[in-house]
Amino acid sequence: MQRIGVTDYTILGTVKGAELELVRFTHPFMGFDVPAILGDHVTRMPVPVPFTPRLPRPGRLCDRSEIRPGKPLTRLARTALICRALIRRWMARTSYSDSVNCHTQPISAIFDYKDLRFEPPSNRISPAGQTSVDRLLQLSQGQAVEGQSAVARLTGEKKNHPGAQYANRLSPRIANNHPATQQTLFELGSGAKERNAINVSYLTALGTPGFTLMLPARMLCGIVSDNNFTQKQLCPSPARCTRGPAEPAKRGPWLEPGLVIRKDGLRTGKLLSSLRGLCLTVLRFQPTVPCFCRLALSSSVAISSTGLVNFSR
């Protein structure tokens, strides 16, 4: 928060026994509210001896509870198990000095300001190794509408993404909302089935001009934007997407007319710009027409009604 000059914030609640505070503040550059978790809880959270450092199944991170100002958040003892595993996972990736950046996100969940609910993200893995898209969030003026969709295969193959049939994959209630209505559609999928693919998650957005998306900077592997959403191949190794500019022939044909946002927040391309602040990369869509956008993420994601992407794995 000091990095972007935030001095005033509102405390929404505290996490029992973890020295954490859930706060909300107004971003000084973009003007929207940002939820954040403050505290060095990873190295200080007590870990019961019987617990082993292994992660639970997706959707089992924490219990469903209410967030109210001045009252602690109830949580399962399994949260300590998650934190112990995260310590080993992140030691090789980053330092503990920026704990809010990488260590709070894996135990975060969806924050819905409409009724201040606190719920864990959920997803289902089909036997074929694909992610069954069971949650679609539609954002319009900060309000989220949940819907169900059919199984979507986000492997980057052309036959799986015909532009004319994409809307037919969604539920009727969601498919009727065309991008011309100035609404934004998100979809979560996995690309681990490909032979040379790394086990990452892909976030597909149907973005409209001026839409803003926030996500933790260190979790973004790459982003590809395409007006047609066809004939594009995902990078087989997301790590290659973060090494800076390179020849399109070495990176794949999907770079044209797409673009890639690197981990350091620098941008290449002309459709999208990024802003670094409070450990978040703020992506603002600036196309002239609604376009599809796919993000390669290094963890599973859950999207809130404010556009903040929390990671859980």
Swiss-Prot record:
Residues 1-15 form the signal peptide. It comes from the Bacteria. GO terms for molecular function: beta-lactamase activity. Its EC number is 3.5.2.6. Transmembrane segments: none annotated. The keyword Cell inner membrane does not apply. The active site is at S190 (acyl-ester intermediate). InterPro entries: Beta-lactam_class-C_AS. GO terms for biological process: antibiotic catabolic process; response to antibiotic. It catalyses: a beta-lactam + H2O = a substituted beta-amino acid. Induction: By penicillin G, impenem and AmpR. Keywords: Antibiotic resistance, Hydrolase, Signal. GO terms for cellular component: outer membrane-bounded periplasmic space. It is an enzyme of class 3 (hydrolase). Upon expression in E.coli enables the latter to utilize penicillin as a carbon source. Belongs to the class-C beta-lactamase family. This is Beta-lactamase. The lineage of its organism: Bacteria, Pseudomonadati, Pseudomonadota, Betaproteobacteria, Burkholderiales.
